[in-house]
């Protein structure tokens, strides 16, 4: 990957945008019986959440193959959070129309029971009915019906898992969201979009030149990214539904590190048009001239908006080594946020604005760290030697990042408290640049 000046790396500041080309978590893959295995994945999970909810998830009645596949996706979704303990529901015979024996399930150790049915109509569409029971309170927590085609069944399973997760934890689930990443195979780069568990990958863009720094628009309809196909780094915005793309930052020098404003109307970018890399604001449709935000004697790069849209968090070496700063959209003095260690890069802010995520060099290793902004407490979430490219889930409960194990690039995930970790290795190609999409419903 070409060296770009507006970024940081271990060897020198001028190499750092190459750190964008690392791996992403396809957050855990479980294949459905009705879907071919288009990716070869190995998943390992370690750790559990501070609280584990015991739940039985029965195969959906009415169609043995599809009913079992639906339940397997739901089980896999909930299992990888580390917050649920599965109770065996084999042979339960539960249907949505039969009464549930709360005491029996409670005796088996299940506080919650999820079950349902699936049937196919004359038009070929499937009706899926689902129920969630609380065996402690002896009532039904949730119940809803879905209708969809065969290719939509997996997404419906994710939606059911989202409902279960939210009803029990009070936090919105992210199983039906999407991720984007760059797949490098040989001399070809592909910008791909997939389900949060890595299934159903779709190619949004293919190029012989590098593609880096993909980032989702707030409504999930577009991706901004950096492409080198014109011979230098240029920031583009692509509409996923039409694949139409427009350049939004194509100025003198390097154009890099796009980040969407919360309202989707603007992008923060790093430009070298006036010399060293500095932070600018450009319009998301490419219609306005760039507005400069930072003016420092050092290199400023890797911007990200705060959730309220009033300020930008970015990486700068103005203090000597790369650290993370915050500045208002009106410019002015920047406030330093990180003080532990001499090297902190790649900032990401949690959806509620309370936690900063970044790559920290500690004891010669590069790890994903989180900083509680109100208290100033730093927590190292990972323990690898080369962990990079963190990205928050839209509910703030999980983090995607890139790791290296046994000399190979793998995708990894960690819960926001560091208790539950996952690794996922891909056999073919290199998967880079994790970015988790927003809620879209």
Curated annotation (Swiss-Prot):
Any one GO cellular component localisation term in the record: periplasmic space
GO biological process, one term: cell division
Domain of life: Bacteria
InterPro entries reported in the protein's UniProt record: 6-blade_b-propeller_TolB-like, PD40, Tol-Pal_TolB, TolB_N
Keyword Cell division: yes
Keywords assigned by UniProt, alphabetized: Cell cycle, Cell division, Periplasm, Signal
Recorded family membership: Belongs to the TolB family.
Known function: Part of the Tol-Pal system, which plays a role in outer membrane invagination during cell division and is important for maintaining outer membrane integrity.
Record NCBIfam families: propeller_TolB
Entry protein name: Tol-Pal system protein TolB
């Amino acid at each position: 990957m070409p060296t770009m000046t507006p970024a940081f790396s271990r060897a020198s500041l001028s190499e750092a945008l190459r750190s964008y080309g690392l791996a992403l978590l396809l957050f855990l893959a479980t294949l459905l019986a009705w879907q071919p295995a288009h990716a070869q994945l190995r998943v390992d999970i370690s750790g559990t959440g501070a609280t584990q909810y015991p739940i039985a998830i029965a195969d959906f009645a009415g169609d043995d193959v599809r009913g079992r596949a639906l339940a397997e996706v739901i089980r896999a979704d909930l299992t990888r959070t580390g917050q649920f303990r599965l109770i065996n529901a084999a042979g339960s015979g539960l249907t949505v129309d039969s009464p549930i024996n709360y005491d029996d399930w409670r005796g088996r150790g299940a506080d919650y029971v999820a079950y349902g049915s699936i049937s196919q109509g004359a038009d070929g569409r499937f009706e899926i009915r689902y129920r969630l029971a609380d065996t402690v309170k002896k009532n039904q927590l949730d119940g809803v019906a879905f209708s969809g085609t065969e290719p939509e069944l997996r997404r419906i399973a994710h939606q059911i898992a989202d409902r279960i997760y939210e009803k029990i934890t009070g936090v919105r689930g992210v199983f039906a969201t999407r991720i984007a990443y760059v797949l490098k195979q040989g001399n070809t780069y592909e910008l791909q979009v997939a389900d949060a568990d890595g299934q159903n990958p779709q190619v949004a863009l293919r190029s012989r030149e590098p593609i880096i720094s993909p980032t989702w628009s707030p409504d999930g309809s577009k991706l901004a990214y950096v492409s080198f196909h014109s011979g230098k780094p240029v920031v583009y915005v692509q509409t996923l539904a039409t694949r139409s793309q427009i350049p939004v930052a194509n100025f003198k020098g390097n154009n890099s590190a796009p980040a969407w404003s919360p309202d989707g109307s603007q992008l923060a970018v790093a430009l070298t048009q006036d010399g060293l890399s500095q932070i600018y604001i450009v319009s998301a449709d490419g219609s306005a001239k760039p507005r400069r935000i930072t003016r420092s004697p050092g290199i400023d790069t890797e911007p990200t908006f705060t959730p309220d849209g009033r300020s930008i968090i970015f990486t700068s070496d103005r203090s000597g080594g790369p650290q993370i700063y915050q500045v208002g959209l009106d410019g002015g003095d920047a406030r330093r946020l990180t003080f532990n260690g001499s090297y902190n890069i790649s900032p990401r802010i949690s959806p509620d604005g309370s936690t900063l995520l970044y790559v920290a060099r500690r004891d010669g290793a590069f790890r994903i760290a989180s900083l509680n902004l109100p208290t100033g407490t730093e927590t190292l979430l990972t323990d690898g030697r080369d962990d990079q490219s963190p990205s928050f889930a839209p509910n703030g409960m999980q983090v995607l990042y890139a790791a290296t194990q046994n000399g190979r690039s793998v995708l990894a995930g960690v819960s926001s408290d560091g208790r539950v970790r996952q690794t996922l290795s891909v056999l073919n190609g290199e998967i880079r640049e994790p970015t988790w999409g927003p809620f879209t419903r």
